[in-house]
């Protein structure tokens, strides 16, 4: 008997899938969250790199969408947004509901998951915990970057490419995705 994925998760995340000759057993369980992950108003330190990458992705997506609608090309023929427009777009990015993001566990390590975050091999099946404190934490993280760098600097980095935007927000020697910070995260 084959069950759709939501039913598999509902019935303990165990099922036998595949064709008649090649049966594969898959199982998944929800990540076990510690008190900080459950109750803190702030993004836990070990998830800040993922959160930063999610924010950079959403900013880039929304700015690109706004530029596609714009009718004001710059000297190179690309669409350039007015300051008031990109300020509004970035503010709306941070104010969105962030419901498509959550936390799951990969190789005994908790990671944020959602649009713009898949890097490396993903598990064949996993359980994501979304809602709860995660949308508010991502919104706060987004507004933190707006305050730290400002809309002008963020838009300028975006105009140089998505990689530059992510480097501005997440890189640097003390950024959440710096090698030093990631090494400390792995030690935990």
Swiss-Prot record:
Any one biological process term the GO annotation gives: positive regulation of cell population proliferation
Tissues showing expression: Expressed predominantly in the spleen and lymph nodes. Abundantly expressed in marginal zone B and B1 cells. High expression in mesenteric adipose tissue (MAT). Expressed also in pancreas, perigonadal adipose tissue (PAT), uterus, subcutaneous adipose tissue, heart, muscle, ovary and liver. Very low expression is detected in brown adipose tissue. In PAT, significantly higher expression in stromal-vascular cell than in adipocytes. Expressed in macrophage RAW 264.7 cell line.
Main location group: endoplasmic reticulum
Effect of residue 94 to A: Small loss of electrophoretic mobility
PTM summary: Forms an interchain disulfide bond with IgM monomers.
Impact noted for substituting residue 49 to A: Reduced electrophoretic mobility
InterPro entries: DUF3456, MZB1
Alphabetically ordered keywords of this record: Disulfide bond, Endoplasmic reticulum, Secreted, Signal
Disulfide bond recorded as keyword: yes
Superkingdom assignment: Eukaryota
Subcellular location: Endoplasmic reticulum; Endoplasmic reticulum lumen; Secreted
Cellular component terms per the entry's GO annotation: endoplasmic reticulum chaperone complex; endoplasmic reticulum lumen; extracellular region
Disulfide cross-links: 49-177, 52-170, 94-142
Phenotypic consequence of residue 52 to A: Reduced electrophoretic mobility
Pfam family, one: DUF3456
Position of the signal peptide: 1-20
Sequence motif Prevents secretion from ER, location on chain: 185-188
Family according to the record: Belongs to the MZB1 family.
Function: Associates with immunoglobulin M (IgM) heavy and light chains and promotes IgM assembly and secretion. May exert its effect by acting as a molecular chaperone or as an oxidoreductase as it displays a low level of oxidoreductase activity. Helps to diversify peripheral B-cell functions by regulating Ca(2+) stores, antibody secretion and integrin activation. Acts as a hormone-regulated adipokine/pro-inflammatory cytokine that is implicated in causing chronic inflammation, affecting cellular expansion and blunting insulin response in adipocytes. May have a role in the onset of insulin resistance.
Subunit structure: Part of the ER chaperone complex, a multi-protein complex in the endoplasmic reticulum containing a large number of molecular chaperones which associates with unassembled incompletely folded immunoglobulin heavy chains. Interacts with HSP90B1 and PDIA3 in a calcium-dependent manner.
Protein name: Marginal zone B- and B1-cell-specific protein
Gene source species: Mus musculus (Mouse)
